[in-house]
Regions:
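Short amphipathic alpha-helical segments
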Residues: 3-4, 87-88, 112-113, 140
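N-terminal membrane-anchoring alpha-helices
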Residues: 1-57
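N-terminal cap/lid segment of alpha/beta-hydrolase-fold proteins
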Residues: 53-92
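Catalytic nucleophile-loop/oxyanion-hole region of alpha/beta-hydrolase
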Residues: 105, 132-149
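The serine-hydrolase catalytic nucleophile loop
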Residues: 104-118, 138
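Short beta-strand element of the alpha/beta-hydrolase
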Residues: 95-103
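Conserved alpha/beta-hydrolase
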Residues: 118-138
């Protein structure tokens, strides 16, 4: 009888641990793929960039003034989600284009300082995409590289 109770308690404990780990895994996966804080507005992102990198304000203002900061949208063929990007042509014609991709929970505006270097200093065309569920792109979760087209 005593052995049977020990087996029952151990089985229940193992089941509880496995259930807790499974629940925790799904919770963390949902938390990491759908964070609430990554949806800054364009104005909030620009304010941050002008505060942290004041040298890009005249550049961005001049791009907006001449219409060189172009919003581009495409629809992903994989899941028909609208994806947003900024495209900035170089001041002189060139075949060089830099695709500059932001990191986890960031957006295209918050990497403009790198775009400045490629466009202003090196003379490249630049494409700054907002990945799915970031910035102005749509989607219901962050993609981690799989099924991204």
């Amino acid at each position: 009888m005593k052995r049977r109770n020990i087996l029952f308690i151990l089985s229940a404990l193992i089941l509880l641990i496995v259930g807790g780990l499974t629940w925790g895994s799904f919770y963390m996966l949902n938390y990491s793929l759908r964070p609430d804080k990554n949806k800054e507005t364009k104005e909030e992102s620009l304010a941050y960039m002008f505060r942290e990198y004041p040298y890009i304000k005249p550049w961005i203002d001049s791009l907006q003034e001449v219409g060189a900061l172009r919003d581009t949208n495409i629809y992903s063929p994989a899941n028909n989600v609208k994806l947003h990007a900024y495209y900035i042509k170089a001041s002189r014609p060139t075949t060089h284009t830099a695709v500059i991709v932001h990191g986890y929970t960031d957006n295209a505006i918050r990497i403009m300082q790198i775009g400045y270097m490629y466009n202003h200093d090196l003379g490249f065309n630049i494409l700054l995409p907002d990945l799915q569920y970031h910035g102005q792109s749509e989607g219901n979760a962050i993609q981690m590289g799989w099924q991204v087209s």
